[in-house]
Structure formats: C-alpha cells, structure tokens
C-alpha cells in the first residue's frame, strides 16, 4: 500500500510539471557521455607537438537504445593538423582480459610516460617521475586509449551486468560499437585507421578488425604487441605438446640473458636460429614418439635441451622432456633461491617457498604495478582534470575469472566450436577481404606469456597468398612482454611504428 501511494504521489508531481520540464526531468535521469578537455605538449624527434587531450565517456546502448555501459577513454589529437579529419587515428588497448589501457598510455605510446628502470629492477617507492614521452606516436597518429567494460572507469549501466561484456564475442561487439560511435561522433570516418592491441588485446584485435570491416569500416593497419591468437600454442595441457616446442626458444633466450649457459653464446639471434631448428625438427619428433622413443634418443635430446636452457640433463629426463613455463621460471635460478617473471623473465626476485615448482606471485607485476597505479591516478586527476567517484580499476580480476571463451569463427553459420579458442581465421579473413590491410607484429625475446616463436607459428598459420604475405611486418626486441619497459626497445618500437604507419597510409592507390 505504501509503495502504491508513493507511485501515485510521483505521478501527481509529474502531471503538475510543464511538458518541457517533464522531458528535462526524464533526460536528466538518463546517463550521458561526459568529457574534460585539456591541452599539452610533447617533444618527439626534437619537435614540440601541441595536442588536445579529451578524457571522457561514451554511452553504449542496446538495440532498444537503452543505455547498457559507460566506456571511458582518453584521446590525444595533434593540434594544427592540416585537414584534421584525414589525419591517422589509432585505437589502443591492453589485454587481460580485465586490464585497463594504463600500460600502453602511461608506459608506451601516450604523450606522458612513467619512468621505470630499463634494467628490470624493481621500481622504488613514490614519488614517481611522469615525464615527456619522446616515443609517443602522436608525431604520426592521433590515439584513443580505450578501457573495456569492467576496467578503468568503464562499467555496466542499469540492469546490464558484466556477463553481457565479458567474453570473446561480447567484448568484440562492445569495443566495436564504441569505435563506431567514436568515429561518428568526432567525424573520423575518412581518417586512416589503425587498431593497436597488446597481449589479450592482440586476440581481441584479430576478431575486432574482422567485425569492424564487416560493418563497412575499413582499416589501414593492425598493430600487435606480444601476441596470442591461438591458445593451443600457449596452453600447457595434457595431450598438447605444441607449447613445449614453441616455448623452447624463449627458454634459451632467457637462459642466455641470465648467463646460465656454458659456453655463453655471443650472438643471441644466431643462437636462437639453432634452437628454433632443433625445436622444429629433433625436439618435436621426439615428443611425437612418446613411449616409443628409445632411451638412447631420449638421452641425446635431453643433453641438447640442457645445453640450450641451462637446466640439467637429469632434470629434463625427470620431466619426460616436457618443462612448462612455471617449472622453468622456478628452476632456472633455483640455486640462488630466485624465480623469474612470466611476462618478462628479465625480472627476478626471491622465491617465497623455494621448494615449489610454480611462482607464488607475479614477479614483474610486483616490480612495476605500484608505479603505474600511482601514476595513472595522479595523472588523470591532476593533468587531465578528470575526477570520478569510482575507483580506477587498473586490473579487474573478476573479468578474467568470469570470461566466456567461446568464439564463433567466421564462415560458420552455427555457434562456437569446442577446443582451443583461435582467432587466426578472423585475421586471415580480414586481410583477404581488405587486401590493402597491413599487419605489424612485435614480440619480445624474454616473454613467457606470449613467446615470440609461438607468435611466428600462429602468423605462419594465416596461410596468406604470397602477395599478402608482403603486408606482414615482424619485429623482435630484447625485452619481455611489455616492450616499452626497456628504453632502447621502446625507441626501436617507436621507429618501427613510425615506418609502419607511413607504409600503411601511403600505399599505391
């Protein structure tokens, strides 16, 4: 009875309002996009670039135009560009799933950069140095950093829940709709366009480029940093020997970095070519033989594995010639009581329990997360003047824990298929249907999250026609997963990005 009286009271109030006041009242109750504009400068190649930064949100709506999510972004546009509507624009995001775009924005390609040691040492406590980033891509492209729903300040609205966004295809749809809305709102349809994803962001990108091109939005280039496109190549599961083969060159590179090899190879690239050849031919053949592998053959393979990784021959035999990433990280420097990082094995720290064969904590994250968390919270409030009552979620573990890994591949009229999730067919379709699309692939030698040789394997699985294979540009760096954590690698990445954007924009027409 009380609820009915309240409802009647509200109806009477609304009836008493003039029509325009009633409309305004309804509109004010609906979520709306908001943004804050600031201005800054960045010096790149000795040239001062003036830019406009816009930190804000766009509202995603369902088919009934009901608001379902508020998506936060930070966009940087170069000021004074001739024919600004035709200037290149790059949409950038990190991975997870469940990560905000803080890493790329504050560490890699944004105009400001939080300074961390290049030598993989733990970052000291605050205050942190947030400086001019001479390796930003603003010299070549405007850039929009996007926080997927559930990360950063982005969140579901109304009755919508994370389940509607936290999945391979759900994520592609929401990110795709954001990009379409952004391009329409800010009149960038005629701009050369790029997608740039890191880690799981590369997986997202391979499906997203196909989704957007199916909506009629053509792209000039796709940029992948630390790629995972087919989880069969990186999932250590019973019956799947592929990761053992594809991770081996990274084990060798990491052992080389930590001087765990005897003799110590002088040239890493030449050394890795030998390891790759061994992995493809001798090692893979040995694993395929299973129990039929002779003891003599097993000894020969174990000896070679020991030579290439620094782990003892007896350790490899005990492991049945199969050492997963967790085991390698804890075994390599175990005599010193140290473990290496997963995403960047240059990072080392003490093992909490040296008897365990798996990491108890993320070594790289423990070294850098504090700096990035503090820096982005300070930067958003003090430099961009964006204030929110919500916490900025650098990483949201709930997203990854509740992620729907099913994916409907292109050219299939029915739903997702069982097995390892794979978006290689999506990227292949995007490159074939848009034969001008350029692909840039970047990988770090010391990355055990997305190993460089696994990346090469999946890119080769695109099976592109010979002419389109010329559109694939692959680069390797002497660093781990986050290529920008080492300044020389970041400088090389910047050089390669500049060249790639030029190639992609200035194609023959």
Language model: regions and residue ranges:
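Bacterial N-terminal signal peptides
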Residues: 7-21
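N-terminal cap/lid subdomain of alpha/beta-hydrolase-fold enzymes
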Residues: 25-26, 65-166
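A catalytic-pocket lid/entrance helix-loop region that shapes and gates access to the active site
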Residues: 111-116, 212-309
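Alpha/beta-hydrolase fold nucleophile elbow
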Residues: 188-199
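Glycine-rich nucleophile elbow surrounding the catalytic serine of serine-hydrolase chemistry
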Residues: 197-210
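Alpha/beta-hydrolase fold catalytic core
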Residues: 291-443, 448-449
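Short alpha-helix in the alpha/beta-hydrolase fold that links the catalytic acid
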Residues: 437, 451-461
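Catalytic histidine-centered segment of alpha/beta-hydrolase-like enzymes
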Residues: 478-489
């Amino acid at each position: 009875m009380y609820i009915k009286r309240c409802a009647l009271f509200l109806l009477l109030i609304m009836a008493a309002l003039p029509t325009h006041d009633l409309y305004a009242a309804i509109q004010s109750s609906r979520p709306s996009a908001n943004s804050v504009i600031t201005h800054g400068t960045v010096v790149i190649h000795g040239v001062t670039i003036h830019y406009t930064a816009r930190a804000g949100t766009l509202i995603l709506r369902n088919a009934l135009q009901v608001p379902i999510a508020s998506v936060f972004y930070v966009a940087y546009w170069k000021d004074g560009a001739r024919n600004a509507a035709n200037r290149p624009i790059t949409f950038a995001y990190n991975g997870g799933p469940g990560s905000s775009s803080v890493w790329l924005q504050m560490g890699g390609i944004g105009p400001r950069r939080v300074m961390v040691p290049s030598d993989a040492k733990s970052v000291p406590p605050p205050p942190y140095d947030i400086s001019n980033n001479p390796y930003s891509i603003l010299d070549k492209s405007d850039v929009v950093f996007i926080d997927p729903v559930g990360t950063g300040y982005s969140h579901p609205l109304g009755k919508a829940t994370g389940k509607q966004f936290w999945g391979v295809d759900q994520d592609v749809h929401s990110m795709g709709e954001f990009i379409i809305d952004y391009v329409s709102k800010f009149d960038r349809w005629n701009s050369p366009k790029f997608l740039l994803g890191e880690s799981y962001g590369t997986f997202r990108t391979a499906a997203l480029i196909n989704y957007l091109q199916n909506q009629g939005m053509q792209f000039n280039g796709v940029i992948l940093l630390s790629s995972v496109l087919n989880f069969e190549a990186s999932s250590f599961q019973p019956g799947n020997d592929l990761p053992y083969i594809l991770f081996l060159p990274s084990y060798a590179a990491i052992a080389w970095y930590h001087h765990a090899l005897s003799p110590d190879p002088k040239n890493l690239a030449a050394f890795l070519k030998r390891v790759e050849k061994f992995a493809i031919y001798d090692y893979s053949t040995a694993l395929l033989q299973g129990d039929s592998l002779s003891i003599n053959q097993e000894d020969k393979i174990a000896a070679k594995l020991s030579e290439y990784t620094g782990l003892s021959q007896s350790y490899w035999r005990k492991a049945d010639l199969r050492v997963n990433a967790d085991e390698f990280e804890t075994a390599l420097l175990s005599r010193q009581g140290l473990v290496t990082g997963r995403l960047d094995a240059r990072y080392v720290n003490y093992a909490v329990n040296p008897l365990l064969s798996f990491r108890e904590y993320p070594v790289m994250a423990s070294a850098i997360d504090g700096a990035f968390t503090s820096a982005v919270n300070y930067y958003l409030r003090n430099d961009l003047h964006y204030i929110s009552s919500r916490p900025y979620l650098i990483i949201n573990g709930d997203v990854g824990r509740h992620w729907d890994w099913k994916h409907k591949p292109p050219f299939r009229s029915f739903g997702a298929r069982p097995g390892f999730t794979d978006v290689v067919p999506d990227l292949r379709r995007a490159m074939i249907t848009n034969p001008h699309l350029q692909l840039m692939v970047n990988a770090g030698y010391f990355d055990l999250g997305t190993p460089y040789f696994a990346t090469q394997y999946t890119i080769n699985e695109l099976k592109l026609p010979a002419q389109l294979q010329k559109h694939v540009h692959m680069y390797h760096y002497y660093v781990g997963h986050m290529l920008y954590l080492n300044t020389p690698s970041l400088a090389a990445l910047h050089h390669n990005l500049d060249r790639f954007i030029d190639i992609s924009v200035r194609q023959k027409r």
